[in-house]
């Protein structure tokens, strides 16, 4: 019986060739569009999900008010992270990223390469974010000044091999020791760094709540209601720096063009 159904269907297709071609082409285009949209949505929703603790990682943003105008900034002040960890038991860890929109001149042989995918980060960076190491211990890699963590492709680019542990790179005429090599950052991440330098090498004298220079991330303890936490800390911190702060969950927000 099924065989007869196929025969009838085939005869109808042959009988109405033009109509059949239009229908089949339309169906194929519709399916292709559906698959492309589905893949795009899945990719967007996967941003930063590679982090083991993605559901508990948040970025501290500042809503700065100047007169009647309000500015939403993806940065916060120098002491923000340390203050939150000290004053709020809900905060398990924090880390700061500095200079993500800058660049450094990296020496390679006799030439200098202007690298834009660079930043400075606290030693706690790898306690918050999951970036697998190929060599070295990322938990301690940025504990000292003049240290840097690089990606696998960067190691091969500068040294011809991923085995770059202990080697020296010169950035802006300052030597840095490579203390860890990590896998290249996934495409579905709002981080796109090739060099992560120690925060100890950042020459800043800010130390107040009005200097918005850092991207601050916090790792909340399991079971924390971040909405109530955000409301509480906004009231307290806002009295110190005259701004309103908010936390953005980096497990669910895609930050385009951050780095």
Where are these regions (language model features)?
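N-terminal Sec/SRP start-transfer signal
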Residues: 1-31
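Generic recognition of well-ordered alpha-helical segments
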Residues: 4, 8, 15, 78-82, ...
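Glycine-centered tight turns that cap/initiate beta-strands
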Residues: 18, 89-93, 163
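Short aromatic/hydrophobic contact patches that present stacked aromatics
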Residues: 26, 59, 215-217
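Alpha-helical transmembrane segments
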Residues: 29-58
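Short amphipathic beta-strand/extended segments in non-transmembrane regions
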Residues: 58-62, 77-134, 240-241
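Mid-to-C-terminal secondary-structure elements
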Residues: 119-134, 146-259
């Amino acid at each position: 019986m099924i065989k007869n159904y196929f025969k009838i269907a085939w005869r109808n297709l042959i009988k109405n060739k033009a109509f059949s071609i239009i229908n089949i082409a339309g169906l194929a285009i519709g399916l292709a569009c559906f698959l492309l949209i589905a893949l795009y949505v899945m990719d967007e929703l996967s941003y930063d999900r590679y982090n083991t603790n993605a559901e508990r990682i948040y970025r501290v943003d500042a809503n700065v008010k100047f007169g009647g105008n309000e500015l939403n900034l993806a940065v916060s002040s120098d002491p923000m992270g340390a203050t939150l960890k000290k004053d709020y038991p809900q905060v398990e860890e924090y880390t700061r990223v500095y200079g993500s929109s800058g660049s450094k001149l990296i020496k390679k042989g006799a030439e200098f390469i202007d690298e834009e995918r660079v930043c400075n980060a606290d030693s706690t960076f790898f306690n918050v974010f999951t970036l697998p190491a190929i060599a070295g211990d990322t938990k301690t890699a940025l504990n000292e000044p003049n240290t840097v963590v690089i990606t696998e492709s960067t190691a091969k680019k500068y040294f011809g091999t991923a085995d770059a542990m202990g080697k020296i790179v010169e950035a802006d005429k300052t030597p840095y020791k490579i203390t860890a090599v990590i896998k290249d950052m996934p495409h579905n991440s709002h981080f796109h760094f090739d060099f992560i330098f120690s925060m100890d090498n950042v020459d800043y004298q800010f130390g107040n709540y009005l200097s918005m220079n850092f991207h601050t991330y916090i790792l909340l303890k399991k079971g924390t209601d971040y909405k109530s936490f955000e409301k509480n800390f906004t009231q307290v911190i806002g009295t110190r720096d005259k701004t309103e702060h908010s936390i953005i969950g980096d497990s669910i927000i895609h930050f385009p063009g951050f780095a």
